[in-house]
């Protein structure tokens, strides 16, 4: 293990876990101990230059052009809906919930999150809303239940597209909820509101200005956008961009967790959008991951029976820590 750590850096350490070279009764507690009160530990341990250079080159090849973005999304999201059903809650929501009391189930917390977004955007009957990155249709379904607004929701995942369409048809609201399979950069039209829930992590740093510019173009004059994002602390972002890490190379190719400053700069660079309210949900994100990890571990045997081998399962357990 230590030889791989020296040769391959932090990625070698992660890969050694995936390969079964080391284990621990409580992976989360072990990783928390490594990182406790030591922010520098979050910066990658590079290992040997040639190995790291190869990883960086591979990541560069996965930059989110329109054609590559579809491949990156498919790698992560098209693993099979039955796989995700085993550890997500019944809303099939793959983004942070909001635990208002701390005692509610993940499903109730996800519905509370959707309700909060709908209330904040003030969606009304007759308005047309756009969702960029609709996942399995959780927000679309909740919006249909709560309002009379129209919604166009987009994804480029084949599995999500099929599931979300069937979901909307089953609910009988296909007359006002439309699921489309289209890259956000190809969208046209005018919308009263735009919502994007933890999709920005799939955009890529170099495409952030394009993302916000497209949102601005799609909004009406009095329109507003709501973006839910996992963020990187500003003081770590430059180092993060220079390196590669476990998630971006092993789990979600092409992904990038932006900092708040990076998003604000991207907004100013190519759009006339104006940031207003910011809500920090860091605790809720950590809690959501914990609930997912618990369900994943509880259902690991069922996941294995679907054909996902031990290497794959260990990769996802590590990812959910």
Which residues are covered by each model-predicted region?
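Feature captures hydrophobic
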Residues: 1-110, 116, 123
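Conserved class I S-adenosyl-L-methionine
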Residues: 125-133
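Conserved SAM-binding loop of SAM-dependent methyltransferases across substrates and taxa
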Residues: 136-147
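Conserved SAM-binding loop
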Residues: 164-165
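A short acidic, Gly/Pro-enriched loop at the edge of an enzyme's catalytic core
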Residues: 185-194
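A short glycine-rich, Lys/Arg-flanked "PGG" loop and its adjoining helix->strand segment in the class I
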Residues: 209-222
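Conserved beta-strand signature within the Rossmann-like core of class I S-adenosyl-L-methionine
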Residues: 222-230
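Substrate-binding/catalytic lobe of Class I Rossmann-like enzymes that use SAM or dcSAM, i.e.
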Residues: 231-321
């Amino acid at each position: 293990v230590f030889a791989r750590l020296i040769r391959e850096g932090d990625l070698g350490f992660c890969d050694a876990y995936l390969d079964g070279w080391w284990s621990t009764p409580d992976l989360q507690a072990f990783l928390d101990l490594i990182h406790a009160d030591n922010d520098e530990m979050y910066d990658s341990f590079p290992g040997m230059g040639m190995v790291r250079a190869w990883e960086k080159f591979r990541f560069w090849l996965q930059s989110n052009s329109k054609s590559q973005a579809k491949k990156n999304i498919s790698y992560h999201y098209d693993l099979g809906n039955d796989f995700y059903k085993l550890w997500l809650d019944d809303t099939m929501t793959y983004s942070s919930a909001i635990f208002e009391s701390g005692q509610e189930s993940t499903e109730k917390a996800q519905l509370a999150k959707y309700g909060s977004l709908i209330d904040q955007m003030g969606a009304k009957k007759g308005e047309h809303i756009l969702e960029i990155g609709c996942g399995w249709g959780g927000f679309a379904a909740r919006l249909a239940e709560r309002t009379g607004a129209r919604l166009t929701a987009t994804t480029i995942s084949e599995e999500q597209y099929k599931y979300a369409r069937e979901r909307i048809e089953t609910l009988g609201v296909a007359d006002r909820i439309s699921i489309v399979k289209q890259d956000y950069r190809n969208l046209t039209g005018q919308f009263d509101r735009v919502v994007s829930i933890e999709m920005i992590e799939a955009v890529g740093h170099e495409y952030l200005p394009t993302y916000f510019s497209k949102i601005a173009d799609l909004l009406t004059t009095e329109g507003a956008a709501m973006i839910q994002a996992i963020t990187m602390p500003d003081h770590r972002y430059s180092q993060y961009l220079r390196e590669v890490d476990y998630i971006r190379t092993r789990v979600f190719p092409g992904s990038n967790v932006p900092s708040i400053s990076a998003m604000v700069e991207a907004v100013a660079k190519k759009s006339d959008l104006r940031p207003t309210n910011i809500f920090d949900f860091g605790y809720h994100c950590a809690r959501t991951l914990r609930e997912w990890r618990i369900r994943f571990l509880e259902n690991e045997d069922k996941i294995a029976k679907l054909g996902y081998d031990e290497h794959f399962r260990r990769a996802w357990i590590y990812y959910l820590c």
